Amino acid sequence: MPVHEIRHPLIRHKLGIMRRADLSTKSFRELSQEVAALLTYEATKDMPLAPASVEGWCGTVEVDKIAGKKVTVVPILRAGIGMLDGVLSLIPGAKVSVVGVARNEETLQAHTYLERLVGELDQRLALIVDPMLATGGSMVAAIDMLKRAGCREIRALTLVSAPEGIDAVLTAHPDVQIYTASIDQGLNENGYIMPGLGDAGDRIFGTTQKHAE
């Protein structure tokens, strides 16, 4: 299945706290990173391993090491930055690519305004991070950009997803795996996820929310 709703008890508990409207910026930011780390654990379970040897305290020890493609983490600005450290806490050697995608609040259409991608993308697994998968426009635009640059293995990590956004991504890119902490009810008339988390970018950075979900 290309869509994975991770219903681990720790994720369910932390996400429940994040839904509180009165949660502090500090707590929301920390929980975003914690849930991102748990999603990363799930999204990398099938990474290939190769045997290796190390010198232990009692002599040579046979161990496993991660093999295969290197990883690039791709936060979609700006809200994706809030998940970045959570992913890097588990994969500290990963390179970071940055994609800027903005959504027109009237048309709900996404457009890219920034592209800072690492090299050798054809040899990397890309983990795109964005807290909210709403209409799917931003995610599709980011995937389009990565594929144009040569990346062929892409996974998306989101805190909350709407069915409409999932459908949009899989229609455009059926080869992409989606890992999300929750599939919510759907979008309201303004294109916001219900019940959602509110504006994740505003809640992570402490700026004023223009709309509430």
From Swiss-Prot:
Cofactor: Mg(2+)
Catalytic activity: UMP + diphosphate = 5-phospho-alpha-D-ribose 1-diphosphate + uracil
Example GO molecular function: magnesium ion binding
Binding site for 5-phospho-alpha-D-ribose 1-diphosphate: 78, 103, 130-138, 199
Lineage: superkingdom: Bacteria
Listed CDD domains: PRTases_typeI
Function: Catalyzes the conversion of uracil and 5-phospho-alpha-D-ribose 1-diphosphate (PRPP) to UMP and diphosphate.
Protein name per UniProt: Uracil phosphoribosyltransferase
Originating gene: upp
